[in-house]
From Swiss-Prot:
Gene (name only): ERP29
Function: Does not seem to be a disulfide isomerase. Plays an important role in the processing of secretory proteins within the ER.
Subcellular location: Endoplasmic reticulum lumen; Melanosome
PROSITE patterns: ER_TARGET (PS00014)
Coiled-coil stretches noted in the UniProt entry, renumbered to this chain: none
Protein name: Endoplasmic reticulum resident protein 29
Predominant place of localization: endoplasmic reticulum
Organism: Bos taurus
Subunit structure: Homodimer. Part of a large chaperone multiprotein complex comprising DNAJB11, HSP90B1, HSPA5, HYOU, PDIA2, PDIA4, PDIA6, PPIB, SDF2L1, UGGT1 and very small amounts of ERP29, but not, or at very low levels, CALR nor CANX.
Prevents secretion from ER (motif): residue ranges: 255-258
Pfam families with a match to the protein in the record: ERp29, ERp29_N
Length: 258
């Protein structure tokens, strides 16, 4: 009969793994699902590996409504192959966690959270987000920079058509794209037809009123949401309308920071 192996000896190879699993998640104190915590070392390793990286700079232990909005955004990023969401926790006391990055980007802690969008590994020219810390507003801003995230009311096929419509230079080309969208309605699910028709309505308005219609309509709807008391259902419908309107903004446009 084989000699019995002492229990402690049989478990010894697992000790390092068990130690790692029982250790704190990371030194920054951040545990947001869908977001990658970065420090002064990993920041420079990770940013170049993704086409787009949205980085939130914040206190070491963020909380409250703005952090809740960020959590929703981080989870929603699962729908994008091009976008990585990350966060950097900063502390100006004790070990002065990640202060090097705070100084590099001239961050003011009174303005936390601060969002920067890095593209193609460019550390020197990130784009600052200056809108409201609301998941819908940030996603619309990202969409304006060519980053697609699944948003309520939006239909990928019609988002693509809207992009082609805005890039088209002549009236005839735009009319042709409008007709294409109308012809495609037959294949749209019944539950989505209302929103597909809204894309077509916006195309018609642009043909009639010009390029400024999407931006002015977004401003109008945003003011309605902010100032008027309305049911949650009505507010949700208006938010979907805002989401659809962003498909008609030229890539890199920043007018949607509302």
């Amino acid at each position: 009969m084989a000699a019995a192996i002492p229990r402690a000896a049989s478990l010894s190879p697992l000790f390092p793994l068990l130690f790692l699993l029982s250790a704190p998640q990371d030194s920054s104190g951040l545990h947001t699902k869908g977001a990658l915590p970065l420090d002064t070392i990993t920041f420079y390793k990770v940013i170049p590996k993704s086409k787009f990286v949205l980085v939130k700079f914040d206190t070491q232990y963020p909380y409250g409504e703005k952090q809740d909005e960020f959590k929703r955004l981080a989870e929603n990023s699962a729908s994008s192959d091009d976008l990585l969401v990350a966060e950097v926790g900063i502390s100006d006391y004790g070990d002065k966690l990640n202060m090097e990055l705070s100084e590099k980007y001239k961050l003011d802690k009174e303005n936390y959270p601060i969002f920067y969008l890095f593209q193609d590994g460019d550390f020197e020219n990130p784009v600052l987000y200056s809108g409201a810390v609301k998941v819908g507003a940030i996603q619309r801003w990202l969409k304006g920079h060519g980053i697609y995230l699944g948003m309520p009311g939006c239909l990928p096929a019609y988002d693509t058509l809207a992009g082609e419509f805005i890039r088209a230079s002549g009236v005839e080309a735009r009319q042709s794209l409008l007709k294409q969208g109308q012809d495609n309605l037959a294949s749209v699910k019944e539950t989505d037809k209302k929103w597909a028709e809204q894309y077509l309505k916006i195309m018609g308005k642009i043909l009639d009123q010009g390029e400024d219609f999407p931006a002015s309509e977004m401003t109008r709807i945003t003011k309605l949401i902010e100032k008027n008391k309305m049911s949650d259902g009505k507010k949700e419908e208006l938010q979907k309308s805002l989401n659809i309107l962003t498909a008609f903004q030229k890539k890199g446009g920043e007018k949607e920071e509302l």
